[in-house]
UniProtKB/Swiss-Prot annotation:
Subcellular location: Mitochondrion inner membrane
Molecular-function annotations in GO: metal ion binding; ubiquinol-cytochrome-c reductase activity
UniProt-listed GO biological process terms: mitochondrial electron transport, ubiquinol to cytochrome c
Residues given in the record as heme b b566 binding sites: H97, H196
Lineage, top ranks: Eukaryota, Metazoa, Chordata, Craniata, Vertebrata
Keyword Metal-binding: yes
Similarity-based family: Belongs to the cytochrome b family.
Gene name of the encoded protein: MT-CYB
Transmembrane segments: 33-53, 77-98, 113-133, 178-198, 226-246, 288-308, 320-340, 347-367
CDD domains with a match to the protein in the record: cytochrome_b_C, Cytochrome_b_N
Protein name: Cytochrome b
Assigned keywords, A-Z: Electron transport, Heme, Iron, Membrane, Metal-binding, Mitochondrion, Mitochondrion inner membrane, Respiratory chain, Transmembrane, Transmembrane helix, Transport, Ubiquinone
Species annotation: Anourosorex squamipes
UniProt-listed Gene3D superfamilies: Cytochrome Bc1 Complex, Chain C
Oligomeric and partner information: The cytochrome bc1 complex contains 11 subunits: 3 respiratory subunits (MT-CYB, CYC1 and UQCRFS1), 2 core proteins (UQCRC1 and UQCRC2) and 6 low-molecular weight proteins (UQCRH/QCR6, UQCRB/QCR7, UQCRQ/QCR8, UQCR10/QCR9, UQCR11/QCR10 and a cleavage product of UQCRFS1). This cytochrome bc1 complex then forms a dimer.
Amino acid sequence: MTNIRKTHPLMKIINNSFIDLPAPSNISSWWNFGSLLGICLIIQTLTGLFLAMHYTSDTLTAFSSVTHICRDVNYGWLIRYLHANGASMFFICLFLHVGRGLYYGSYLFLETWNIGALLLFAVMATAFMGYVLPWGQMSFWGATVITNLLSAIPYIGSDLVQWIWGGFSVDKATLTRFFAFHFILPFIVAALAGVHLLFLHETGSNNPSGLSSDADKIPFHPYYTIKDILGVLMLILILMMLVLFSPDLLGDPDNYTPANPLNTPPHIKPEWYFLFAYAILRSIPNKLGGVLALVLSILVLAFIPLLHTSKQRSMMFRPLSQCLFWILVADLITLTWIGGQPVEHPFIIIGQLASILYFTLILILMPLASLFENNLMKW
């Protein structure tokens, strides 16, 4: 008799995705982040669901309802901080996952890569709207500043902003719709993640060497299930250390002050995971130019497969490209730091140089380095 997991219509899908899936024998821990992102999404959805049971999306009571969750609801403080810091862990895993894809040439799986880029946009939109919900000072002013950027779009800009706001400023209507969108988007993210996996399993995983691994495959279970469990335990350890020892480490103190439209905070800045894009936005004096640069800083990921000029897939055997890749990582860390600094000398010029370097590396230097490496190989 055939095993039920291989015949049952539903079990068969799970079996072919997580149990009998043929996987390369040499994939490193950099391949753990896909499963970690899945765990992050589950944690965020569950904690978010429980928070939504006690949250009220009204400007008069939103801030109080979050306070009520932390003070009066059983383990409400734990759920709230798991959700807030879970978002940070989500983005750490996202950045490492994308970085892995860049380094090892995984972007040559076009459908998987482009759905991944779409997923990144969707998660960023979800996180932005979630940050508005506690209705603190940074929530309100962050929402005002970021939504206002759409007014830079020629002709329809101001109408578009008022349409999103549901009025002439960020107010009750804005908060209510942001809560609705913040609730529905994670389910869209989950569906997209399913499609992401579907396309990945059409080709099979890439591996560190970038070479075909068809001749050397091993079953996903037990090898990679055990390996993924180790990653999950490490993720939960870091998350719990954050939540239980320093839950406000990555937050902004201004968000413990209720939103006040009459009082602007001295430094308006988003959560740490948006700071690199915020720095790029601020480094261009023109409003429309800044918005375009902001969108392009993420959208550039979609162009990376077109810029692949190397004869090798992975960077494993390409020292020059490796060097440029790590310069790009350092540049992104610099941009993240600059995004959190006030707009004054010397931060302005550092931000502008780092922004120019970011686009130059991706669009010009890395493709040129690949061409140069091709010539070194005498192919």
